[in-house]
Design a protein with these regions (language model features):
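N-terminal alpha-helical targeting/anchoring segments
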Residues: 1-134, 149, 153
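TRNA-recognition modules of translation machinery and tRNA-sensing kinases, especially anticodon-binding
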Residues: 27, 130-429
């Protein structure tokens, strides 16, 4: 959410930003909120003047009563009563205007960083860098569910009977591999100085609207019936929410947390072969990282965060690349974002496995996350990044570590979490 003072002083910058994000339908909102803001300030000035006059008249009434000027006092009493009624009317209007302003301001997108490429959607994202050499083996790589089934490692049919499409039972070595990746990612981030945390898996609506747009909320979140609670779609929401309505000191910054949680999402995406299996599902687990920091440090942390994900994947022998998200692919609160994509030898292309975002002070403004500085208070900056989401990680891991005999090699870093095993073997049927 933008600072209303910034919008008031820089309407053309805000409008150009909206155009850069290809959201021209929101352009009229800028002028609308400026008019509402003007009316809001007029109301406050009128109320202030009326209260001052009311207070002055009240003192005069007391003096008149003492001097037995009862008729004059009655005239002033009537005037005070009229002022009180007008103040009440204006207070009602003020509340309505402020609600309208807040609603519009929650819709206007955050100002993107000047370095963000201008583009309409994810097809115009820009490749930044590749890490590791993509390899296509001289044998056929099966679809990921077929690889899992060879280890008796997934049961989609039973999950469909129990919960419907978009769920799975992971079994045996595949389930163990899933847990191994999560445990390794946890320790990886702890070793990089992050504090480990398991957050609430449900959050209230004021936290939801503090961390994302209404459109994102509607597309992602499951609401608990009869409760002001939503199942989290990612633990970053719960983790950022931890700081709601808090004032931190500069000495307490940065806050660097890594969190584990199950995640629940309504979204399914477009149908197609890559939508089968575990690529896009309703329930999955994830290791996340968030940072709350000073504004001047947020871009430095942004670089550190996505590099953590790259380093994690490379430690498991998985080639990756980074993509700079273009303006039209950025969610409304984001200032800058980079996707990390893993190499798929089966598809002979990269696919998304994580995303790192700098949200500037947008979430902090919505949630009231302030910092007490030497020269006054200011809003913190917040960032988030996927450490690893095992469903997609498993796809990349299995494809890149599959051997010609059907076994899967376990990289050295994962072996302590897999009982020391160097590979997992195909199960005999």
């Amino acid at each position: 959410m933008l600072d209303i003072k910034f919008l008031r002083s820089n309407p053309e910058i805000v409008k150009q930003n909206i155009k850069n994000k290809f959201q021209d339908e929101k352009l009229p909102l800028v002028d609308e909120v400026i008019e509402l803001d003007l009316r809001n300030r007029e109301i406050k000035q009128e109320v202030e003047a009326l209260r001052a006059e009311k207070n002055k008249s009240s003192k005069e009434i007391g003096a008149m009563m003492a001097q037995k000027k009862f008729e004059e006092a009655e005239v002033l009493k009537k005037k005070v009563s009229e002022s009180a009624g007008r103040i009440e009317e204006l207070s009602v209007e003020e509340k309505e205007v402020e609600e309208k302003i807040k609603k519009i301001m929650m819709t206007i997108p955050n100002i993107i960083d000047p370095s963000v490429p201008i583009g309409k959607d994810d097809s115009e994202n820009v490749e930044l860098e590749r890490f590791g050499e993509p390899v296509v083996p001289d044998f056929e790589i099966p679809y990921h569910t077929e690889i899992m089934e060879a280890f008796n490692g997934i049961d989609l049919d039973s999950a469909r009977k129990v919960a419907g499409n978009g769920f799975d039972y992971l079994m045996g070595d595949i389930a163990r591999l899933h847990s191994a990746v999560i445990s390794y990612a946890r320790d990886f981030m702890i070793n990089r100085g992050f504090t480990y945390c398991i957050p609430p898996f449900m959050i209230r609506s004021n936290v939801v609207t503090g961390v994302m747009s209404f459109a994102e909320m509607d597309a992602m979140m499951y609401k608990i019936e009869g409760e002001d609670l939503y199942l989290i779609g990612t633990s970053e929401h719960s983790m950022i929410g931890k700081f709601i309505n808090t004032q931190l000191t500069e000495e307490e910054l940065p806050q660097t947390l890594t969190s584990y949680s199950p995640c629940f999402r309504k979204e399914k995406g477009a149908h197609g072969i890559e939508e089968r299996g575990v690529y896009r599902i309703h329930q999955f687990e994830k290791q996340e990282m968030i940072v709350v920091c000073k504004p001047e440090e947020s871009m430095e942390w942004y670089e550190k965060l996505w590099k953590n994900t790259v380093d994690l994947f490379r430690s498991m022998d998985i080639p990756v690349r980074t993509l700079e998200c273009c303006s039209g692919d950025l969610a409304d609160l984001k200032v800058k974002s980079v996707d990390v994509e893993a190499w798929s030898p089966r598809q002979k292309k990269y696919f998304e496995v994580g995303s790192c975002s700098n949200l500037g002070d947008a979430q902090a403004r919505r949630l009231g996350i302030r910092v007490k500085g030497k020269d006054g208070n200011y809003f913190a900056h917040t960032l988030n990044n996927t450490v690893v989401a095992p469903p997609r990680m498993l796809i990349a891991f299995l494809e890149n570590n599959l051997q010609a005999d059907g076994s899967v090699k376990i990289p050295e870093v994962l072996r302590p979490y897999m009982g020391g095993n160097e590979k997992i073997e195909v199960k005999k049927k």
